[in-house]
């Protein structure tokens, strides 16, 4: 059974004026059985003032924006790059309204996914990015390519539920609490949370049995969770901090991240997203708005908030009733 609804974020904190990690494709897990999903495709918070999440359900047969429909981007790489620049600027403009921020973040995510799969476009797209945005562009494209390299194309969609993540200010408080307790940088915990489950939006076990927002194997969580709940954002983020600290994060950060997931590509992607989240005031707010995608035999498939499947679904069957 599949159910789908569309959910929108309504949080004053998420505006670019605030100072301050799928769609990552569905992935085959490593070590902790990471769900490396494409959200993939974050700023340095101090005291974030966020509201909760407000949802609006849209009928699946709505003619203008069918439920689960992806943003439509230019097919020409040069125009795609120009549109991406416009969206990146809108995401950093304090006057941009929430609806426009959401739309820009969704387009940005899809653009980075497309550019990530087409390195032959680099000679066209990269020169069109202004110097002020080039670091953001390079970091996102590189992270996307690293994650793509470690994931497999799927013929079925996973048995997941896609739900709104915890409120942004709550997640930020958990990352900072874990940093204070473990010494592991808050931005690295956010990057891992982003890559693993799109900040907790994906509710589903990996094929290796990893669970929860930070994708722990139950046996591993038992050693670092201090009796907490593997499905709790707070408890799993705190456990991730302890795990990384115990594996030498302070002296060899990349080794500790590799212990979390045995893939050099994973380590590199975490490093890139963590750097972006720490350096760019708009980054986390933008990533928080990203969707969940799976890279399939039919291309990218958007799994919107409200997607729920109790067993794997052939991609063609899903697309027959949920056009992209």
Language-model segments: what does each one mean?
Residues 61-172:
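N-terminal export signals and maturation junctions of secreted/periplasmic proteins
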């Amino acid at each position: 059974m599949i159910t789908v609804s569309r959910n929108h974020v309504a949080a004053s904190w998420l505006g670019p004026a605030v100072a301050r990690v799928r769609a990552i494709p569905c992935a085959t897990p490593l070590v902790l059985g990471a769900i490396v999903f494409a959200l993939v495709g974050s700023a340095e918070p101090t005291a974030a003032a966020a509201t909760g999440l407000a949802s609006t359900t849209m009928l699946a047969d709505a003619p203008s924006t069918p439920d689960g429909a992806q943003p439509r981007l230019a097919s020409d790489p040069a125009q795609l790059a120009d549109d991406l620049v416009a969206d990146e600027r809108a995401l950093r403009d304090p006057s941009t309204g929430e609806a426009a921020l959401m739309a820009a973040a969704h387009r940005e995510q899809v653009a980075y996914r497309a550019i990530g799969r087409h390195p032959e476009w680099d000679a066209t797209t990269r020169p069109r990015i202004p110097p002020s945005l080039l670091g953001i562009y390079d970091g996102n494209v590189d992270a996307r390519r690293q994650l793509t390299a470690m994931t497999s194309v799927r013929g079925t969609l996973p048995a997941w539920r896609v739900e709104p993540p915890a409120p942004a200010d709550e997640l930020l408080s958990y990352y900072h609490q874990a940093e204070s307790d473990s010494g592991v940088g808050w931005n690295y915990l956010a990057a891992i949370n982003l890559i693993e489950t799109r900040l907790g939006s994906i509710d589903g076990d990996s094929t290796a049995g990893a669970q929860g927002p930070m994708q722990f194997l139950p046996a591993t969580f038992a050693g670092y969770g201090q009796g907490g709940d593997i499905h709790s954002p707070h408890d799993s983020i705190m456990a991730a901090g302890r795990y990384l600290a115990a594996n030498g994060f302070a002296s060899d950060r990349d080794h500790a991240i590799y212990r979390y997931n045995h893939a050099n590509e994973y380590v590199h992607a975490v490093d890139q997203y963590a750097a972006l989240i720490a350096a760019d005031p708009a980054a986390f707010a933008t990533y928080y708005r990203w969707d969940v995608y799976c890279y399939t035999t039919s291309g990218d498939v958007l799994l919107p908030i409200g997607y729920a499947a109790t067993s794997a679904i052939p991609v063609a069957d899903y697309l027959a009733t949920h056009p992209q």
